[in-house]
Amino acid sequence: MNKFIYPGSFDPVTNGHLDIIERASKICDKLTVAVLINQSKNPLFSIEERVSLLKKVVKGSTNIEIECFSGLLVDFVKEKNANVIIKGLRAVSDFEYELQMALLNKNQAPDIETLFMMSSINYSFLSSSMVKELARHGGNISGLVPECIEKEIIDKFKLK
């Protein structure tokens, strides 16, 4: 069984993330979207909220699960008995960083492969940071995030 892990902070999940999730889920038996608990970041959404948003976005998918993790990614991948890490790339600048991480992961866990997936051209500019900045200032985020969570993102800034 091919088990893939797609890690990220997903703060919030965007249509770019969803594009990678949908495409990756078609080439594996099971895809775990792994939401990183990163103590050094100050996320807009709590880990519970990010997991909940992702579950809402992938509702109805039969081979996708959402989990959170902390610590080393390779340890989580081993724990899940997965064999591939999926990484989405938007631009050359993403590749430089992700290549270094893939090589480090390979050093730590030689049996785990990293598969790079280019973002669809429609989302090659998109990041969670950009979505948050737009939403913070009342910009239009429709088409950038899954429609089913758009209101929750906008409402998050109304509470601040």
UniProtKB/Swiss-Prot annotation:
Where does the record place the site Transition state stabilizer? H17
Keywords, comma-separated and alphabetical: ATP-binding, Coenzyme A biosynthesis, Cytoplasm, Magnesium, Nucleotide-binding, Nucleotidyltransferase, Transferase
Which cofactor(s) does the record list?
A: Mg(2+)
Residues annotated as coiled-coil are none
The pathway that the record names for this protein is: Cofactor biosynthesis; coenzyme A biosynthesis; CoA from (R)-pantothenate: step 4/5
Q: Which CDD domains match?
A: PPAT
UniProt: substrate binding residues: S9, K41, L73, K87
Q: State the EC number(s).
A: 2.7.7.3
Q: Name one GO biological process term.
A: coenzyme A biosynthetic process
Highest taxon listed in the record's lineage = Bacteria
Record InterPro entries: Cyt_trans-like (IPR004821), PPAT (IPR001980), Rossmann-like_a/b/a_fold (IPR014729)
Main subcellular localisation: cytoplasm
Question: Cellular location of this protein?
Answer: Cytoplasm
* Gene Ontology molecular function terms on file: ATP binding; pantetheine-phosphate adenylyltransferase activity
The entry sums up its family as follows: Belongs to the bacterial CoaD family.
Name of this chain's protein: Phosphopantetheine adenylyltransferase
Q: Which organism is it from?
A: Ruminiclostridium cellulolyticum (strain ATCC 35319 / DSM 5812 / JCM 6584 / H10) (Clostridium cellulolyticum)
Provide the organism lineage as a comma list. Bacteria, Bacillati, Bacillota, Clostridia, Eubacteriales
Gene name per UniProt? coaD
